[in-house]
Amino acid sequence: ADYPMRRFDKTLDVNFRAPFQVLQNSIPLLRRGVEENPDGGAKVIALASMAGVYSEAGLAVYGATKAAMLSLVETLNAEESGNGISGTSIAPGYVDTDMSDWTKDKIPADTMIRVGDIVELAASVLRLSSRAVVPRLVVTRAGAGLGA
């Protein structure tokens, strides 16, 4: 795939390096949160993408960074869920946002996933006890197959 390295670096920085650094720097705070609320634990919600689960032409770099986010959260669970810290990646298909404007000639906005649906999923995960770990949620549009 033809992809300028400058754009590659920016995509990697925004979609993976920055979230990795935030997570890494947050671990001490999350551990304190577990001490204060052992039953609720501490939770991390990461926004991934369906492109990190299923490949799509033209989205190689974007999809790779989102797949890295999925792996990061699953590794967080392997390392910290026994200590009460867990993470969930939400990997939606096309959501009706400015980022999906480029698809609206093929996918009408009124068929896309609503932002509110993603917010509600995150809120639901946050209400779970520390004993429940949901590594990833893959969300697709109604009437669309997986990967759409």
Locations of the language-model features?
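Substrate-binding pocket helix/loop in short-chain dehydrogenase/reductase
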Residues: 1-9
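Residue(s) in the substrate-gating loop at a strand-loop-helix junction
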Residues: 49
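Active-site-adjacent segment of SDR/Rossmann-fold oxidoreductases
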Residues: 54, 75-85
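Active-site loop immediately N-terminal to the catalytic Tyr-X3-Lys motif
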Residues: 54-60
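C-terminal helical subdomain
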Residues: 82, 89-90, 97, 105-148
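Active-site helix of classical SDR
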Residues: 23, 65
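A short helix-coil junction within the Rossmann-fold of NAD(P)-dependent oxidoreductases
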Residues: 25-40
